[in-house]
Every structure is written in structure tokens, then in C-alpha cells.
């Protein structure tokens, strides 16, 4: 059985920590250390200055369960990679495992390979069977390349006679606490822009990206916009890893890589010499130079005569203009076409059907082999405001292939969304049909004609902001005669031409909705370049405020997969000029003037209480849902029901309709110390906390997330008038009843007027006669 773990380790490995000196001791008294039966000599060179050792467990990489190896040749694979600017000098696998007491020691063992080369074999003696064991396995660092595959394989036998390859006694478990430790030494890279985004971002590195930004003096809003463009680009590259961008106006980072924004008047003295290549700034310029404080670090310099030049240089970077050499002068840049709503590269298009082949990075991800294959996973990032009312679901045109069983059995293709089951399609060589006429019609076709076409409808309730469509091929082994091999190789595949179609859905959603904001950056990311979004800074923003702005823009870039080329950054005094845009506010109650000016519009006032709690709100909160005039969520507590006492280190995240323009949104971050925002970003990167961001108000207290719903709702998007009327009256039956009564009265009044007129005409005609 083959289990392909869709994970990537790298030289740093996510959530890295120092490798314990005695891993076996950590397991407690019940874990025994095992000496491998075969371990090649590890050629571990001493790390050079600047080297580091890091380790990560399978649990830290997302596998919080035991990996089970089953069958006579059960295996599991974990790919890992090494950064371009690091070289591995030593590697160790601390394997924690157990195995079946039924395994024959002289015929069975566990094999560990790196890139197909065996590095260790572990015995399965009877004395240690069924126990949790630990083994430290040195790995020859010469075997470790850029991209690597760690495989664990069980060679298992329970009898010397004919055996069932799937017998229940053939198993071995690999504990999620198993860890891989890599000692790395920095590798010098040339100062060459052609390597970008390396070393500032390396796709091989699965850790969260932390890239400092340095401004030689306090940046104006135009310079910060240029920096935001670059931050959003790096955020789009980081994707699921997440990214934070510490900002500094004090000094260059003491170590590592960083991005620097400067003009001739602010260029650091280290680069003002002629041999630097950047001393004479005559226009938009991008350069890569060594960090003068760290011989292993690099600086990405974005330079220009003024803020306009800086924006042009930042745009060239974000649009991946071809650059080479240590220094590049940016010429004319053709402006990219304006983005259309919902056309973000990372989002499933709602304009036309989307091929599955466009939703995976490699075609091989749609293929599996073996009797116990891994899942086929297709990522689906849907627009948050899809209007799914009265829709059966999302249509999928599925084409799939598989090894046809010789006769009908229990083989099937199971379809699910995240953890929610959708349907089972028997692998009979024909499309599946539930109705008798369709089954009869399908039986007329040729059995085994591939690909099999199946129209599916995916239930919308199972989808989340970042969903995963999963396909599991289950192949039922045929039963053969004793000692006769009747187990041919089997495989299954989802055709890349299979499609998912959102083109029939409108975009309409009740707001505020902080779940859509936290997960997808909505409504700001409705346009991928953020051309209708404005960030409002607090008064006298400090370094932490600058970092928060850059990290937010990086978060938006990760959602859309596109840089925020047209996001605007302003002070509170200029907000009136941006009335027709969605606004994002930052600051404290004192540093952000708009919190005081718009106090009447905030869902939570300065004393932590609701500010718009009226008799109608009290009444509607107590009406049954089907009688309510309001369409807000009723599954969350309201701000009027919560006694909230914000503390200085709390973070308030609020959503409300813009006081400047109907239908426009405001999302506000309020905290006394801008450094508290780092805890909110950490919560976004934690799936267990991210799901708690809901409603119109989120309160982050230490590591606890509390979501509240405000007393007012507004809507964004558009519906055709007939659809809107049907939807509105279905949610507001009281208004429907009143409308019906009003129409009846109007009809009665019209009928009365007509009848009286008709009567008068008859009387006049009769009198004339």
C-alpha cells in the first residue's frame, strides 16, 4: 500500500526547533532505542560558521496521526527539499515506530530510503513487537539534493506458506512524533536578479516567510504603497505558508535577507560609494547586494529618484519583469490591464467552467496507482460571496479512468469535499445512474469505455473558504485460488479536462462578514489588484504600524495570487477623497481619528457596548427567525448580549458599512499597542483559530477568539430583480404579507373606481335615453 503524503519539508522545516540530544529519552520509559541492522556511515562534515540544525516532527508538518504501513510491501513517502542558499552537512531521522507481533523476524523488516538509496533497515524481532520503539538513523548528507523523497517501507510476512498480501496482521505504525533533523551551512549565491525571488523567498522552504523591510527614514504614503506592492507580491509567492514583514527605520538588519527602499537623499552610506553600483540613482532601479552586516545575507534594493520611481520599480518586480545582473535600471513599463471582479488567479473563475488541470500544479497529482492509493486532491478557493440560495449545488463534469475489474465487485470512486462525503461511484465500467431508466440506458453502452463521464452536483454547505475536493479510488482485490497471484497492478485517474462550473451563480452577500475577510481578504480582494481599496494609517505611524500594513497586504496577495498594484494608503485627513472605496482602518482609539468621528457607526463603542441598540433591534432579536425583518446571522451572540470589557492588549476587529458611501465596507483593527497585531496574524495562520473569525466583531484576548454579530446588516453584490424579489420575500414573510395586503387594497381600490365609473356611465346612458 502506498501512502503519498502531500507535504514538503525543507532545510528549515516548519516551526523549526533545536534537535534534542537524546530523542529516545523523550518518549518516556515505554520507548526503547533500537540499533538499525544496516546503517551506512554518515559523512557528516562539521558545520561552517553560520550553520544551524533544525528539526520538525511529522505532527508539526500536519500529520497528527500514525502512518500505518499495511500489506507485504506497504510504504509511505514524504518529500522534502533544501533551500537554494543552504547545503546539508548532516542529517538524522529519529524514527518512532511499532510493528505487528505476527511478523516473521527472518523475513520481515522496515526499510528507510532517501531518493531510492537505502539508508537503514530495522529488524522486526519478537522481543520488541507491539512496543513503541525509537531509532536514530544517520543519513549521508551527500544523498540530500534540492528535492528529495524519504520513503518508509514495510517488508512484511506472517507465514512461510501462501499468504494474503492484505492480511490484517501485516502492519507497522510510524508515530507522528518522528522527526527529521537537518544541519545546514549557508551557500553563497551570486548577486544576480535573475535568481529572484531567491533568496528572499524560496519555494523549497515551507516555513512562514519572514522578510524585513528597511526604510532609511520614515516613509511617506506613496513610498509605503510601493513597499506594499512588493510585500503583496512576496505574500502571493508564500501562499499557504503565510508571510510577515517586520519594518524598521532604525538600521539595516543585523543578519539575513531584507528589502530596502531608498532615494538619493536616503541611500544608506554603505551603498553611496561608486563601487556599489547604485550610488548614482537616475531612475527606477532594482539591485541585489550583499548585506554589509552579514556575509551570508542579501539585500533587495528598490531605488528611485522619488516615490513615483519607487512605485515603477516595485511594479516591475511584482510583474516579474525580466531582470539580470546585480543592478537593473527599469525602463518603460506597460500598465497591466485593469482587473475584473473575481478574476484573482487563485480563485475559481465564475465566468466559465474551470478545468481540473488548471487547479493542480502537476498533472501527476490527478493519478494514483495501487490497491491502497492516496487521495486525489483538488484545491478549490471559491469567491466568498457566491449566491447559492435555492441552488442544488455546484455542477461538476467529471471524467475519470481506472483499471476495469474483470467482474463487478465493491470497487468504487468515493467523492468528498473536505471531510464531508458527497457520493460513491461504483467502478463498473459504466456511468452511475440512480434511476432505473438511466441504468437501462447506460447498460446499452460498451462496458469499459474510458473515460467514464459523470455529472455531479457538489453540495454548497460542505464548502469552506479554502476547500479540497477529494477523490478516493477503492479497488476491491479479486479472490483467487490458493497460491495463485491474481492481483494485477491497478490505477485510477481524474481527467484534467474535468470541469467545475460557477458561471451560473450571482455574487451577493450579507455584510459585515469577518469570516470572508479573514479567510479571503474579502471585500478588498474582489478586485485582485485592490484597485478599490484604501488603507487608512493612524496618526504618526511607527515601525510596527508599517509592518502591520505590509503584512496585511501580503495576506491579500496570498489570497488572490496577484500583487496589490493599486491599493491606496492614506492618512485619516484624506479619507473623504476615497469615499467610493472599501476602507481598512488601523490604530488605537487615540491614534486613529476616524474611530471618534465614526463612533455612531461602530458596532462596538469605546466602552465595549453596542452603540446602535434600539427597540427594533431588541424586538427582532426575539422574534422567530422566519418572522424577522432582519437577515443577519442569529447563531452568534450579538454585541448587545455580551458584556465586553476590552483590555489594553486586546485586538478588536470590526466590520461595518462605510459612513461615506452605501454598499462600501470598512474593516477596522483597533488595539492600544500595534505590536498586538502579531497575535492576530498568528491566529490567521492557525486553522483552529481562523475558523472562529465570524460575524461583524472579533475580539482577540490573549489566544482566545470571540466572535459577535452586530445589530445591522447591509449587502454587497448584485442580483437580477426577479431573483432579488423572490429571495427578499422568502426571508421577510412579514413584508410579503404586508405587500400582498397592500396590493389587494390597491386592486380593490382600483376595482371600486372602475366600477363607480362604469356605473356612472350606465346611468348617464340611461338618462340620455
Where are these regions (language model features)?
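Bacterial N-terminal signal peptides
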Residues: 2-12
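Solvent-exposed alpha-helical segments and adjacent loops
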Residues: 17-769
